[in-house]
Amino acid sequence: MPSTPRQFVLPDLFPLVPFKGSTNPHYVKAAAESSAWINSYNVFTDRKRAFFIQGSNELLVSHTYPYAGYEQFRTCCDFVNLLFVVDEVSDEQNGKDARHTGNVYLKAMRDPEWNDGSVLAKMTKEFRARLLQYAGPGCYARFLKHCEDYVEAVAKEAEYRECGVVLDMASFETLRRENSAIRLCFGLFEYCLGVDLPEYVFEDPTFMTLYWAAADMVCWSNDVYSYNMEQAKGIGGNNIVTVLMQAKGIDVQAACDAVGEHCKLLMERYLDAKEKLPSWGPSVDDAVAGYVQAMEHWIIGNLEWSFETQRYFGAVHAEVKATRVVMLRPREIDED
């Protein structure tokens, strides 16, 4: 019987991505304000607070929205921190409770008058007010739809986790596109850029090929980087590495290699679709070009952030970036 591997090598994704990363000049001031905002609600246990600080959410926002103005950047920081709260709470809930948590967020996003008195509702309402200062009607309508899909997907994820179900590839990919919240993060592009794209852009098959290739690239790379942390926490079922291992009957290294190959295909698909984008006239084309560049910032920014934070690789994140070797962590015992 083969022994359980003690380590695996990450795929080298940086050479696949021909984009230049950058960071936001407003990071230091806005990050401190957003951290203070989230900490003022006392939503974390000591252990969760340490994980929150270690995760460097605002640093992710700096890498992925480097072009955003101060107000927009601060709002994006607040949103990613708010998502962290929703995600961390629902990760430890059953399907029914995760759905309730998601619905609190969703109702507070939809209706400025709704309030159940919870901390999550108050935080969400404050984020909503910031968002609506600059979001156009199309942008906000799409964002709300993504919120609905996200809440539904997170509840389903919790139900599958409760039952110990690992999905097949096709079902997982559909779920992952929604429960990753990447569509919500992409939904902030128009807000940051000060544009409101016509709906017909999002109905164009070439644009959506580009969109899904970018979204999947973020999801797949995130999963391979977060796999070790998630399997140690006992929540590895919602990860493409686990899905590939089960679907193909392969070990962790073969699954990571498969992720690398798929990311190569995704980037080829993205670059091909980018060349084939139609024209909708100068003003729309300019707005679309900004949106496309924003997707590219997310792709490269997510890769760079993953090795600057301790969230996935702890204190050895720089060493892991250099060697790509990850030592498998033992299962954690939750002390909370």
Swiss-Prot record:
Mg(2+) 1 binds at residue 87. The keyword Magnesium applies. Mg(2+) 2 binds at residue 87. A motif (NSE/DTE motif) lies at residues 222-230. A motif (DDXXD motif) lies at residues 87-91. Its EC number is 4.2.3.-, 4.2.3.125, 4.2.3.126, 4.2.3.127. It is an enzyme of class 4 (lyase). One of its GO terms (biological process) is isoprenoid biosynthetic process. Its cofactor is Mg(2+). GO terms for molecular function: alpha-copaene synthase activity; metal ion binding; terpene synthase activity. Belongs to the terpene synthase family. Terpene cyclase that catalyzes the cyclization of farnesyl diphosphate (FPP) to various sesquiterpenes, including alpha-cubebene, beta-cubebene, sativene, cyclosativene, sesquisabinene, alpha-copaene, beta-copaene, cadina-1(6),4-diene, alpha-muurolene, gamma-muurolene, bicyclosesquiphellandrene, allo-aromadendr-9-en, epi-cubebol, cubebol and delta-cadinene. This is Sesquiterpene synthase 10. It comes from Postia placenta (strain ATCC 44394 / Madison 698-R) (Brown rot fungus). The gene is STS-10.
